[in-house]
Amino acid sequence: MSYDTDLLAIENICSFSEKWYHFIKDKKDLKIELRTKSANIDKFLNLDVLDNFIIAFTLSPEDIALKNEKYTASFKNRVKAIKELQNKGWKVRICIDPLIYTDDFEKNYSEMIEYLFSEIDKNKVIDVSIGVFRTSKEYLKKMRNQNKKSEILYYP
């Protein structure tokens, strides 16, 4: 629904996610994905589950999230949100994105995945996607000018 903004994170301000929910409710041949790093799910706990409205959570290991995902919900809060939605009947998509190489890469991601699937219902996961950091060259230049010390933006 939005490439540049986490709509669920600002749902309490603008209600765009709920508006999309109601827009798609009777359009069974159309699917919408709401991708988020937020845990702001309260509104969806009181709405009927729609198979064509996909709530997708982007996850990173806690240490990577703390370092690189400022002002987002913690990894454990996102997992808690997933669990709450699943308990209400929602199926979710899991997005491990962006995959970031660190010294403890295998350990961090293994522990994250083990914890995640020890807490949530794997049968209520639509799928799991894995992605790398990607952006246009022009936007990357702008981000590098604004974030001179970012490891992610200067990674080969």
Task: Indicate where each model-derived feature is located.
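Core AdoMet radical
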Residues: 1-44, 49-80, 91-95, 125-131
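Sequence-level detector for tyrosine residue identity
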Residues: 3, 10, 21, 71, ...
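Distinct, well-ordered alpha-helical segments
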Residues: 12-15, 41-49, 105-113, 139-144
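Conserved C-terminal portion of the radical SAM core fold
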Residues: 78-139
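Acidic, Ser/Thr-rich peripheral helices and adjacent loops at domain boundaries
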Residues: 141-156
